[in-house]
Amino acid sequence: MTRRLENKTALVTGSTSNIGREIAVGFGGEGAHVIVSGRDDARGQAVVARIRDAGGKADYVHADLGGVAASRALAEEAADLLGGRIDILVNNAGIFPGHTTLTTDEDTFDRVYSVNVKSAFFLTQAVAPAMIRAGGGAIINLGSWIARLGLPVGALYSSTKGAVETLTRAWAAEFGPLGIRVNAISPGVILPPDWDPDTEYPGAVFMRGAPAGAPGEPAAIAAAAVYLASDEAAFVQGAVLDIDGGRVNVLTSADAAAVSRPDPAS
C-alpha cells in the first residue's frame, strides 16, 4: 500500500517530545523524510532513532526558536538536509508559562510571543518562497482549544494560540492561490505520551461532561496532521480542525441536561 507522504519532506518544530514528537513519527511512518527540531539534543536524536528504526528517514536540527535569525537558520539547515526543499512545515513549537495576567512580567510576555507566534511567522516567511517555486506545499499550525474558551489561567498562552489560528486563515488567503495549503489543528486536553495510566492527569477535569469524557492521545493529533499534510486534504484550506473530544463545540452533558429539562411551570 502506498504511504500517504511518500517522497515528501517535512520540518516539524518542537518535535523532541509530546505532540510534536508523535507528529514527526507519524510523518516518518507515512514515508516522509522528517526534520526533527528542538532544544533537547538527546531527545531529538531519540526521536530520529525511533523513526529510522521503523524504516523511516529522519534527521535532527537543534533549534532554540524565538528570533528571526533562529527561524531562518532552521529553515536553511532543514532544507539542506532535505535536498533543497521542504514540502510540509508544522509550526508546533510553543511554551506555556505558569503565570496569571497579574504575575506576568515583560520578559515572560516577550518570550512567549517570540516562541509561539514570532517564530512561526518568520519560519513560514523563510519556507514559503521555496514551496512556491516547487509548485506548492502544506503548512500546519498548532492552535489550542483554550484560544476560544475563556479560562482564569493561561491568558497569555491562549492569546498566542488565537493569533496562530488567525494567521492560519490569513496565510490560507495569501498562499492558497500560490499552491500552499495552510490549515491548523486545535488540540484539546491531550495526555503526555509517557503519562502513567494509573495516575489521574490534572487536565482531565476540563473534559468532564464533554462527549469524549477524558483526555485524548497524541496519536489523534498526529493522525490529523498526516491527513492535512497529505493529498487527501487537497480541498481543505484555512481550516482549524478541533481535535478535542467535543470540548469546544458541544455542550457539556450538564449543560445539555439543563437545556433539555422540562419547565416546571409547563
Where are these regions (language model features)?
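Substrate-binding pocket helix/loop in short-chain dehydrogenase/reductase
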Residues: 100-101, 105-113, 195, 206
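Alpha-helical segment proximal to the catalytic Tyr-Lys
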Residues: 129, 173-177, 234
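Short C-terminal tail/terminal secondary-structure segment
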Residues: 149, 237-266
